[in-house]
From Swiss-Prot:
<keyword id="KW-0479">Metal-binding</keyword>
<dbReference type="InterPro" id="IPR029017">
    <property type="entry name" value="Enolase-like_N"/>
</dbReference>
<dbReference type="GO" id="GO:0009986">
    <property type="term" value="C:cell surface"/>
</dbReference>
<keyword id="KW-0964">Secreted</keyword>
<protein>
    <recommendedName>
        <fullName>Enolase</fullName>
        <ecNumber>4.2.1.11</ecNumber>
    </recommendedName>
</protein>
<feature type="active site" description="Proton acceptor">
    <location>
        <position position="343"/>
    </location>
</feature>
<keyword id="KW-0456">Lyase</keyword>
<keyword id="KW-0460">Magnesium</keyword>
<dbReference type="GO" id="GO:0006096">
    <property type="term" value="P:glycolytic process"/>
</dbReference>
<dbReference type="GO" id="GO:0005576">
    <property type="term" value="C:extracellular region"/>
</dbReference>
<comment type="similarity">
    <text>Belongs to the enolase family.</text>
</comment>
<dbReference type="InterPro" id="IPR020811">
    <property type="entry name" value="Enolase_N"/>
</dbReference>
<feature type="binding site">
    <location>
        <position position="165"/>
    </location>
    <ligand>
        <name>(2R)-2-phosphoglycerate</name>
    </ligand>
</feature>
<dbReference type="InterPro" id="IPR036849">
    <property type="entry name" value="Enolase-like_C_sf"/>
</dbReference>
<dbReference type="InterPro" id="IPR020809">
    <property type="entry name" value="Enolase_CS"/>
</dbReference>
<feature type="binding site">
    <location>
        <position position="318"/>
    </location>
    <ligand>
        <name>Mg(2+)</name>
    </ligand>
</feature>
<feature type="binding site">
    <location>
        <position position="291"/>
    </location>
    <ligand>
        <name>Mg(2+)</name>
    </ligand>
</feature>
Length: 434
């Protein structure tokens, strides 16, 4: 039977050694689902609230016992006593949203609500004897995503003196996900050897990318291009580049202040100058995607950027849209960006996540399913990417098990789909004039 008989949460650790929420759901027939909730380092101010305890004597205030308590003492009784079916995802998600009663899930915590939402879906898939991607996407989910591999970390994700948070490679010329992953791994290892030859640090940051002390942004880009070529691939043909500027991290009082991360070598740019700078970079290098090129509240700047280069480059809103359909709807109406980053914990339920993806795709925007810098062994985002035919996934570099787990899950899915599996490569960027 599909009736949920038990919902239980506990405090566990994420990839940074910080507490996070794990939730387990059990049905009367024995179907079981478990979910672990990710956490971000650079967060948009409009994100759903991640509930932390604030008790400095425990995990430096980052404990999640209150969120765990909210699952065990508030959400669980509602679900169990209400005799909810594990197959009724939308009703359960809506019930939790109403139970919280705030616009940002600040009462119960998005980390509490999301853990339950995903665990319910996993238990439903288990009940039906289906893989999660098939339960979520039905027979239509068969497109493997182009991986955006964050092989150099800057900004808030490392100690490197570079403002941009992520430098990514996208193996769009590969014929399958398996091949794209191999290309990425080969480029990653070639980059490591180039860094070693230069006497640069090869330790990795939160998302598994290198965080060496490059001389600046262009040094990082040119070094990545050398690694692509050394691995035997052609930049701008086999493999493209991407940035996550995370501009909100260095924007203040109308100024994009690169000195925050780059010291005396950094520039201070107005919105117009920031647009000029990004346009200059895409003219010089094979860049296909830029995330958060402008501050989340600089909508005028975003409009300038979209009008200037939005037909040539994917412009992804992360802090801008925070997986929120209300904000995305406004962006679509005003012609802001052409893509949304999808992070399940920014909004807090699977139902709302799928609504955001559907809205984006209907408007001709791409949807990039993404991890967070604080991750776990949970691989739900891999299944979501395939279930929704998102076409793109961002889940870190080619090291650290918390990142590789997602890639390995995609390999399994591709194997399972066999001849029905699709990998569209460059065609996944249907929002551009290619």
């Amino acid at each position: 039977m599909p009736i949920i008989t038990d919902v239980y949460a506990r405090e566990v650790l994420d990839s940074r050694g910080n507490p996070t929420v794990e939730v387990e759901v059990l049905t009367e027939s024995g179907a079981f689902g478990r979910a672990l909730v990710p956490s971000g380092a650079s967060t948009g101010e409009h994100e759903a609230v991640e509930l932390r305890d604030g008790d400095k004597s425990r995990y430096s205030g980052k404990g999640v016992t209150k969120a765990v308590e909210n699952v065990n003492e508030i959400i669980a009784p509602e679900i169990v006593e209400g005799e909810f079916s594990v197959l009724d995802q939308v009703s359960i998600d809506k019930m939790m949203i109403q139970l919280d009663g705030t616009p940002n899930k600040g009462k119960l915590g998005a980390n509490a609500i999301l853990g339950v939402s995903i665990a319910v879906a996993r238990a439903a898939a288990d009940l039906l004897g289906q893989p999660l991607y098939k339960y979520l996407g039905g027979f239509n989910g068969k497109q493997l995503p182009v991986p955006m591999m964050n092989i150099v970390n800057g900004g808030s994700h490392s100690d490197a003196p570079i403002a941009f948070q992520e430098f990514m490679i996208l193996p769009t010329g590969a014929e399958s996900f398996k091949e794209a992953l191999r290309w990425g791994a080969e480029i990653f290892h070639n980059l490591k050897s180039i860094l070693s030859e230069r006497g640069l640090e090869t330790a990795v940051g939160d998302e598994g990318g290198f965080a060496p002390k490059f001389e600046g942004t262009e040094d990082a880009v040119e070094t990545i291009i050398k690694a692509i070529e050394k691995a035997g691939y052609k930049p701008g043909e086999d493999v493209f580049l991407g940035f996550d500027c995370a501009s909100s991290e260095f924007y203040e009082n109308g100024v994009y202040d690169y000195t925050k991360f780059e010291g005396e070598h950094g520039a201070k740019r107005s919105a117009a100058e920031q647009v000029d700078y990004l346009e200059e970079l895409i003219g010089k290098y094979p860049i296909i995607t830029i995330e958060d090129g402008m501050d989340e509240n600089d909508w005028d700047g975003w409009k300038q950027l979209t009008d200037r280069i939005g037909d040539k480059v994917q412009l992804v809103g992360d802090d801008l849209f925070v997986t929120n359909t209300e904000i995305l709807s406004r962006g679509i109406e005003q012609g802001i960006g052409n893509s949304i980053l999808i992070k399940v914990n920014q909004i807090g339920t699977l139902t709302e996540t799928f609504e955001a993806i559907e809205m984006a795709q209907k408007a001709g925007y791409t949807a990039v399913v993404s991890h967070r810098s604080g991750e776990t062994e949970d691989t739900t985002i891999s299944d979501i990417a395939v279930a929704t035919n998102a076409g793109q996934i961002k889940t870190g570099s080619l090291s650290r098990t918390d990142r590789i787990a997602k890639y390995n899950q995609l390999l399994r899915i591709e194997d399972e789909l066999f001849e029905t599996a699709k990998f569209d490569g460059i065609k996944s960027f249907y929002n551009l004039d290619k």
